[in-house]
Regions:
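Nuclease catalytic cores that cleave nucleic-acid phosphodiester bonds
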Residues: 2-158
Length: 158
């Protein structure tokens, strides 16, 4: 039985508590990676890693540390692309699973939206930015189900 380690890209992550509940039930290690502002957990299974401030420092730590069979929780598409290429499971906060089949399209969409924002300075300043909808209880439930399923799959060796 493989024992995965769970990594959370913690800055702006709304499901840290849910992940901690699940890892406690399974007696797995949880590594929360942040550049600060996160309260340490009293749970001995939870390790808080504070990295230097700067763009993508937490992402680099996670990408360099997570191994095949581990799970990464992130909303960062480039980080997800890096880790899934190393056979790490990547789960979005809302429970969506990043896969080798869907990551290319997500990276392309992300890059296109960045180009559109850069080309329209008024878009950045207006309410037309788009963005995501509010994080819901349904999203939390989907995340819990996805993390639970990923842990079970890895433990079975699939």
């Amino acid at each position: 039985m493989t024992k995965p380690k769970i990594f959370i890209d913690a800055d702006a992550c709304p499901v840290k508590a849910e992940a901690e509940q699940i890892i406690t039930r399974h007696q797995l290690d949880l590594v929360i990676v942040s550049n600060g502002g996160i309260r340490p957990s009293l749970n001995p299974l939870v390790q808080l890693i504070i990295v230097a401030e700067g763009p993508d420092v937490a992402d680099k730590y996670i990408a360099d540390t997570a191994k095949a069979g581990d799970i990464v929780v992130t909303g960062d598409i480039p980080l997800a692309a890096k880790v899934i290429s190393n056979k790490v499971t990547a789960i979005r906060h809302n429970g969506d699973i990043f896969t080798t089949d869907n990551i290319g399209g997500q990276l392309a969409t992300r890059d296109l939206m960045a180009d559109l924002r850069a080309a329209d300075p008024f878009l950045v300043q207006s309410n037309r930015r788009g963005g995501t909808t509010a994080f819901s209880e349904k999203d939390r439930s989907r995340f819990r189900n996805s993390l639970e399923a990923a842990i079970q799959r890895i433990k079975r060796g699939n």
